[in-house]
């Protein structure tokens, strides 16, 4: 399927059980946990739910199958959908977990970062045993344990103009779990160009926002925010902080919007949903399509078409700069650790290398693909100098 056209697995099965059969369906729910011949249960389930072939599958999704908003065709559509979650932080990790438990058949999680102690206050998929491991890897392992019937891909990379179309192009829908507007504008370019629906969301302080975006049918992100605001204009997590009760709410709203799109039941109007958990207020704002939008009207994909080169990003919430080489490399972390060990303190695992030079205030985390996060500076030029000094180009 492409985005919001739900197609049932079996066209020969009626959309919903007739009212006269409703009691049989409810009886079936009770029968799942009862002593019942497996063959009889199998036949009864298949008679009513084309998407379910075993008692195990019916037991997993039974509470959704009886919802009129989802039903059998809806569950079939979810199981035949592919969703990518960009960013696996406070909101993205919860979105990923909810989509997995809902039964979305194929999930891809993309995240460039590793688990740090500061994440554990609000990023509920992670615990102390996950420290220093890639977020995408840990998250994919944990949601597979929640639902082993689905396919989950983890991509431990920075999403950028060099790889965004290859990574996201297969998706039926994309959910935003990022922490910066530059990546959101890049996702908006990809989705507009390839007509992929997506859900914009974010949380900071005590409030968060969600907006579903469907190319051609609704305004895009740049109709709402034409340009990336100058640094310091938007609130960020390092300045405003984050109350850990707001990301689960925003993630739940975003996941619900994603499910509605996958089922073809999205609202016809474009709403920006704003929720403040401290004040307990919910607002809905209508977003109007910009008739001169450079992205969705003029098809100028500036964030995809920018000059390709090393990407330098100042990271939200940390005194740090990320460097992503234009050409992906394969760094032999163990060998480099041996060399750097003579200079400073080194820790490494299969995925990352952490280096601290005692003569300076910076700390470098290096990934296998050549990407590095330089802590202790917000100056891109200083970060580039540190990278060039310690990492062979």
Regions from the PLM with identified roles:
Residues 11, 16, 26-30:
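Short hydrophobic targeting helices and cationic amphipathic motifs
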Residues 22, 40-393:
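Adenine nucleotide-associated cytosolic modules
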Residues 6, 31-33:
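Intrinsically disordered, low-complexity tandem-repeat regions
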Residues 13, 23, 37:
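Cys/His-enriched low-complexity segments
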Residues 2-11:
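Extreme N-terminal basic, low-complexity initiation segments
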Residues 7, 16-18, 37, 324:
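Intrinsic-disorder/low-complexity coil detector
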